[in-house]
């Protein structure tokens, strides 16, 4: 009897190691559709609503707005929310492993057709030419249709993210009020104003940006789009109330358009208003070109309270897998540098193409698409897949990259790569939360390991479509055993054998091959993988996700101060933020048995509700290399720490040198003290005289203007 039991045990252990799992893993609460502040366990599918499926022909536009032949690429094609509902219900999206959809901005857009000789007219099919942020685009559907989309998605464990573009309304001309709809803005049907004769100052009127500076891109128009003045109290309150309309509908996330082109301070206070009302995961669009690194981009990701689309990731993946203009060393360097630069790397939204870029597939072999998808789905961050990528759609540039969805074939290799790898984000926390370590590399081969506690995923990619490589000297954190390819050989992967010292038996990685091997284990010690939101206030609730927390409540420490536990289970803890000195905190967790977790760093606890105030200083003359910054006695102004001072301030568009200005998020209803400083490298020159004082308004926006004190 004992021998029989031992034999069964050995067989069970052998099967366990072959499949790479120690035990069946049940769905964890951190992966639930209700967890709207954590998308690390999700796969997003980006949909240009008008170009996906026409599910209700009765709401299609008429006349010159609409092209039923789907050839005039800047006209409406008829895609709508009912079409998305249909593809959820028929299993196309769920079958692919999609757990979140990002849809076009749902608000009412202009009805004008702009002249366009190439495409026979240009319309607002894309959703970015808003006229009323509190009404729906009728060509996408009604509020009832939108609610049906939300309900259907949630019933299928899919989160819904909306695009939202508070930077602008629609095309307008300063000199021709008849052009398009003159950028007019409506509040639930009531006209607020248009771009010409803008006596209330709802818009910026500084001309179009030439993208020459960060400041220029913020306060001047993007192309011919009427640029909203968020510092105007009416616009500020309007945009904050508008997003609440959609939050009340039950959306689960927000993608903010053109965050590079709006004031950082206003966006931070806008984000605070969202987090105070109904926190949801929010990420912004800040375009970066190939090999571009922008300190303002990094600062925004770390300090704004929202995440960003990871253009550094996207551009490098395209260089390596699509264009062959860089090697795997460049890919690995990007993974390392972004992990160093971005505080919340697992919140960065990764992608290989989108509606503003050439589609990834450009003909020829489809294997580069499949390799890039596999890399994105197994890398850190939140993967977003552009509609049609799984069908190998092509198209260089707008609008060719926004054609009508061509097929819903569930047999393509790309579809099945996604289908097999997407579920790993929920079943293996190494994929959702793990660190990344390069294990073997040459110009064409990248073998990397994701690890979270005892959970491991090892991924091997050979981008060379004609050359195989012998892999020797490979080590891994996978326990001893034989591991099958999670992809089941879909991209020619095979099994590997791991010895007790972590060495992998040498093997051949064939041309174009991709393989994924994994090990999933329950955790007996606490490990934090995600905290959200990353910007909060005393009394608000944040969510801590990870493994090994146990089922009995312990403690969550903000530095050394414990918060009040709201709920506690083995993978997710909700805790109220304690009343502590505002600033950045490292969070740790202590289980009921006394085990202490890792720390999760840089959670920003604000002084209070935020208001955007424009700080202006006159007569601040500088020498070459000097810039003016702002500091003060609250955490939002750096608490007099010059290394945390706000700036460099601007001096070209709204005001001109020697006047400097900056829009800053500061605590509402608070009397603050502040001063300006000049920085030139490590040299700091303080403003003279007494501290300036200012009482921040309790709501709306503010402006304070002072003279530089000698």
UniProtKB/Swiss-Prot annotation:
<feature type="binding site">
    <location>
        <position position="56"/>
    </location>
    <ligand>
        <name>Ca(2+) 1</name>
    </ligand>
</feature>
<dbReference type="InterPro" id="IPR013780">
    <property type="entry name" value="Glyco_hydro_b"/>
</dbReference>
<feature type="binding site">
    <location>
        <position position="261"/>
    </location>
    <ligand>
        <name>Ca(2+) 2</name>
    </ligand>
</feature>
<comment type="function">
    <text>Degrades starch to alpha-, beta-, and gamma-cyclodextrins, as well as linear sugars.</text>
</comment>
<feature type="signal peptide">
    <location>
        <begin position="1"/>
        <end position="27"/>
    </location>
</feature>
<keyword id="KW-0106">Calcium</keyword>
<keyword id="KW-0328">Glycosyltransferase</keyword>
<feature type="binding site">
    <location>
        <position position="355"/>
    </location>
    <ligand>
        <name>substrate</name>
    </ligand>
</feature>
<feature type="binding site">
    <location>
        <position position="255"/>
    </location>
    <ligand>
        <name>substrate</name>
    </ligand>
</feature>
<dbReference type="InterPro" id="IPR006047">
    <property type="entry name" value="Glyco_hydro_13_cat_dom"/>
</dbReference>
<dbReference type="GO" id="GO:0004556">
    <property type="term" value="F:alpha-amylase activity"/>
</dbReference>
<feature type="binding site">
    <location>
        <begin position="260"/>
        <end position="261"/>
    </location>
    <ligand>
        <name>substrate</name>
    </ligand>
</feature>
<feature type="binding site">
    <location>
        <position position="227"/>
    </location>
    <ligand>
        <name>Ca(2+) 2</name>
    </ligand>
</feature>
<dbReference type="GO" id="GO:0046872">
    <property type="term" value="F:metal ion binding"/>
</dbReference>
<feature type="binding site">
    <location>
        <position position="218"/>
    </location>
    <ligand>
        <name>Ca(2+) 2</name>
    </ligand>
</feature>
<protein>
    <recommendedName>
        <fullName>Cyclomaltodextrin glucanotransferase</fullName>
        <ecNumber>2.4.1.19</ecNumber>
    </recommendedName>
</protein>
<dbReference type="Pfam" id="PF00686">
    <property type="entry name" value="CBM_20"/>
</dbReference>
<dbReference type="InterPro" id="IPR014756">
    <property type="entry name" value="Ig_E-set"/>
</dbReference>
<dbReference type="InterPro" id="IPR006048">
    <property type="entry name" value="A-amylase/branching_C"/>
</dbReference>
<dbReference type="InterPro" id="IPR031319">
    <property type="entry name" value="A-amylase_C"/>
</dbReference>
<feature type="binding site">
    <location>
        <begin position="221"/>
        <end position="224"/>
    </location>
    <ligand>
        <name>substrate</name>
    </ligand>
</feature>
<feature type="binding site">
    <location>
        <position position="398"/>
    </location>
    <ligand>
        <name>substrate</name>
    </ligand>
</feature>
<feature type="domain" description="IPT/TIG">
    <location>
        <begin position="526"/>
        <end position="603"/>
    </location>
</feature>
<dbReference type="Pfam" id="PF01833">
    <property type="entry name" value="TIG"/>
</dbReference>
<dbReference type="InterPro" id="IPR006046">
    <property type="entry name" value="Alpha_amylase"/>
</dbReference>
<feature type="active site" description="Proton donor">
    <location>
        <position position="285"/>
    </location>
</feature>
<feature type="active site" description="Nucleophile">
    <location>
        <position position="257"/>
    </location>
</feature>
<dbReference type="InterPro" id="IPR017853">
    <property type="entry name" value="Glycoside_hydrolase_SF"/>
</dbReference>
<dbReference type="InterPro" id="IPR002909">
    <property type="entry name" value="IPT_dom"/>
</dbReference>
<keyword id="KW-0964">Secreted</keyword>
<feature type="binding site">
    <location>
        <position position="60"/>
    </location>
    <ligand>
        <name>Ca(2+) 1</name>
    </ligand>
</feature>
<feature type="binding site">
    <location>
        <begin position="128"/>
        <end position="129"/>
    </location>
    <ligand>
        <name>substrate</name>
    </ligand>
</feature>
<feature type="site" description="Transition state stabilizer">
    <location>
        <position position="356"/>
    </location>
</feature>
<dbReference type="Pfam" id="PF02806">
    <property type="entry name" value="Alpha-amylase_C"/>
</dbReference>
<feature type="binding site">
    <location>
        <position position="168"/>
    </location>
    <ligand>
        <name>substrate</name>
    </ligand>
</feature>
<dbReference type="InterPro" id="IPR002044">
    <property type="entry name" value="CBM20"/>
</dbReference>
<dbReference type="InterPro" id="IPR013783">
    <property type="entry name" value="Ig-like_fold"/>
</dbReference>
<feature type="binding site">
    <location>
        <position position="78"/>
    </location>
    <ligand>
        <name>Ca(2+) 1</name>
    </ligand>
</feature>
<feature type="binding site">
    <location>
        <position position="402"/>
    </location>
    <ligand>
        <name>substrate</name>
    </ligand>
</feature>
<keyword id="KW-0808">Transferase</keyword>
<dbReference type="GO" id="GO:0043895">
    <property type="term" value="F:cyclomaltodextrin glucanotransferase activity"/>
</dbReference>
<dbReference type="GO" id="GO:2001070">
    <property type="term" value="F:starch binding"/>
</dbReference>
């Amino acid at each position: 009897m004992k021998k029989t039991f031992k034999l069964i045990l050995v067989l069970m252990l052998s099967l366990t190691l072959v499949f790479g799992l120690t035990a069946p893993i049940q769905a964890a609460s951190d992966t639930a559709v209700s967890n709207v502040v954590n998308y690390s366990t999700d796969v997003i599918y980006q949909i240009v609503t008008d170009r996906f499926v026409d599910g209700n022909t009765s709401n299609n536009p008429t006349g010159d707005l609409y092209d039923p032949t789907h050839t005039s690429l800047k006209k409406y094609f008829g895609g709508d929310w009912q079409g998305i509902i249909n593809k959820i219900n028929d299993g196309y999206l769920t079958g692919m492993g999609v757990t979140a959809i990002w849809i076009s901005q749902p608000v009412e857009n202009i009805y004008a057709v702009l002249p366009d000789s190439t495409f026979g007219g240009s319309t607002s099919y894309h959703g970015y030419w808003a006229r009323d942020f509190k009404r729906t685009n009728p060509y996408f559907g009604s509020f009832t249709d939108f609610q049906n989309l939300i309900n259907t998605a949630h019933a299928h464990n899919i989160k819904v993210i909306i695009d939202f573009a508070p930077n602008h309304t629609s095309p307008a001309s300063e000199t021709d009020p008849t052009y398009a709809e003159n950028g007019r803005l409506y509040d639930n049907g009531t006209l607020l104003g248009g771009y010409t004769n803008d006596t209330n100052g709802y818009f910026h009127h500084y001309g179009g940006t030439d993208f020459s500076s960060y400041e220029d891109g913020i306060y001047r128009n993007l192309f011919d789009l009427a640029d909203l003045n968020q510092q105007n109290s009416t616009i500020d309150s309007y945009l904050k109330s508008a997003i609440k309309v959609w939050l009340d509908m039950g959306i689960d996330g927000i993608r903010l358009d053109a965050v590079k082109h709006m004031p950082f301070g206003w966006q931070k206070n806008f984000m605070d208003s969202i987090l105070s009302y109904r926190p949801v995961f929010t990420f912004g669009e800040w375009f970066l070109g190939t090999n571009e690194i922008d300190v303002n981009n990094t600062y925004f990701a770390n300090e704004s309270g929202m995440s960003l689309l990871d253009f550094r990731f996207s551009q490098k993946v395209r260089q390596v897998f699509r264009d062959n203009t860089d090697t795997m060393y460049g890919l690995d360097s990007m993974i390392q540098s972004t992990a160093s630069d971005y505080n919340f790397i697992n919140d960065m939204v990764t992608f290989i193409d989108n509606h503003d870029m050439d589609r990834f597939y450009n003909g020829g072999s489809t294997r580069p698409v499949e390799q890039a998808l596999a890399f994105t789905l197994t890398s850190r961050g939140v993967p977003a897949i552009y509609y049609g990528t799984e069908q190998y759609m092509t198209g260089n540039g707008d609008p060719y990259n926004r054609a009508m969805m061509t097929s819903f074939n569930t047999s393509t290799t790309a579809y099945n790569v996604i289908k097999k790898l997407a579920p790993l984000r929920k079943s293996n926390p190494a994929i959702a939360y793990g660190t990344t370590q390069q294990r073997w590399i040459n110009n064409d081969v990248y073998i990397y390991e994701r690890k979270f506690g005892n959970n491991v995923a090892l991924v091997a990619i050979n981008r060379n479509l004609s050359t195989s490589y012998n892999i020797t000297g490979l080590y891994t954190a996978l326990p001893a055993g034989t591991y099958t390819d999670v992809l089941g050989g879909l991209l020619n992967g095979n099994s590997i054998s791991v010895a007790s010292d972590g060495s992998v038996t040498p093997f051949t990685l064939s041309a174009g091959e991709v393989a994924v091997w994994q090990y999933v284990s329950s955790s007996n010690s606490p490990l934090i993988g995600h905290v959200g939101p990353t910007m909060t206030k005393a009394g608000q609730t944040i969510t801590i996700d990870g493994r090994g927390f146990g089922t009995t409540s312990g403690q969550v420490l903000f530095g050394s101060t414990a918060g009040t536990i709201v709920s506690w289970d083995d993978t997710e803890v909700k805790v109220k933020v304690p009343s502590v000195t505002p600033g950045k905190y490292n969070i740790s967790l202590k289980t009921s048995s006394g085990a202490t977790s890792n720390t999760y760093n840089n959670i920003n606890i604000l002084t209070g509700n935020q208001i955007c105030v424009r700080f202006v200083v006159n007569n601040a003359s500088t020498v070459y290399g000097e810039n003016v910054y702002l500091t003060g006695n609250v955490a939002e102004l750096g608490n007099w720490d010059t290394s945390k001072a706000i700036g460099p301030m601007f001096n070209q568009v709204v005001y001109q040198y020697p006047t400097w200005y900056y829009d800053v998020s500061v605590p509402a209803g608070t009397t603050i003290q502040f001063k300006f400083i000049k920085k030139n490298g490590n040299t700091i020159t303080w403003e003279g005289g007494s501290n300036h004082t200012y009482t921040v308004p309790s709501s709306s926006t503010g402006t304070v203007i002072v003279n530089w004190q000698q």
